[in-house]
């Protein structure tokens, strides 16, 4: 795997053991190579209509108490239809970016995320453009985010949105001293793969 995605075996091992956080680029490369969805990499298992795992503030997912419940038989917080803010599955990336899944269950067709860029946060740790299948849509909620798509660079401000074919090389970065909060949707051309 490491050779196929151009990273070191030790990095893969550290990611597997929770000792290192991947960049967005490495995360997408792993998902693509494994032909897995990002939901799979979030680490939760789909049961019925809902994911029975939640983030616990340390960047790791653990099964919910009473994991035998499904969305239709007593799943808390909206019966599998509502994702409560404090119970989102999260991934903290090495490059100062945090992804919080906004859906209460797995959907291999789409990634619906709140993305938080810390000051100096960047979509890839190597600061190289990323590309993957699908269409990408973003809306800036707060802060200012630099976006590069193809050969164009944009500064996105609160209320601005962006949409493009995500097979075009792209990257994002925060050059300000404040967090950037954005809502991001990636619709996959080949469901089940990132």
In which residue ranges do the predicted regions lie?
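Short alpha-helical DNA-recognition segment
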Residues: 1-13
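DNA major-groove recognition helix of helix-turn-helix/homeodomain DNA-binding modules
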Residues: 25-40, 46
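A short glycine-rich, His/Asp/Glu-containing loop-to-beta-strand
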Residues: 80, 85-127, 184-186
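A short beta-strand-loop-beta hairpin characteristic of the jelly-roll/cupin
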Residues: 125-158
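Short, charged recognition helix plus adjacent turn
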Residues: 43-95
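Ligand-binding loop in jelly-roll beta-barrel domains
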Residues: 97-98, 108, 157-158, 166-192
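Histidine-centered metal-chelating micro-motifs
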Residues: 123, 145-146, 162, 167-171
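Short acidic-glycine-tyrosine-enriched beta hairpin
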Residues: 102, 150-167
């Amino acid at each position: 795997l490491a050779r196929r995605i151009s990273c070191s075996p030790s990095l893969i091992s550290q990611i597997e053991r929770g000792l290192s956080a991947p960049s967005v680029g490495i995360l997408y490369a792993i998902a693509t190579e494994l032909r897995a969805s990002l939901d799979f990499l979030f680490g939760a298992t789909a049961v019925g209509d809902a994911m029975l795992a939640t983030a616990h503030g340390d960047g790791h997912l653990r099964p919910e108490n009473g994991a035998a419940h499904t969305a239709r038989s007593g799943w808390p917080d909206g019966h599998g239809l509502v994702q409560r803010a404090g119970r989102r599955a999260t991934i903290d990336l090495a490059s100062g970016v945090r992804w919080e899944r906004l859906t209460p269950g797995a959907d291999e067709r789409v990634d619906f995320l709140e993305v938080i860029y810390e000051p100096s946060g960047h979509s890839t740790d190597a600061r190289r453009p990323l590309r993957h299948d699908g269409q990408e849509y973003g809306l800036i909620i707060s802060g200012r985010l630099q976006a590069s798509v193809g050969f164009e660079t944009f500064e996105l401000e609160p209320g601005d949105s962006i949409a493009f074919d995500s097979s075009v090389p792209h990257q994002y970065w925060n050059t300000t001293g404040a967090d950037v909060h954005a809502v991001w949707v990636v619709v996959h051309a080949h469901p089940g793969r990132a």
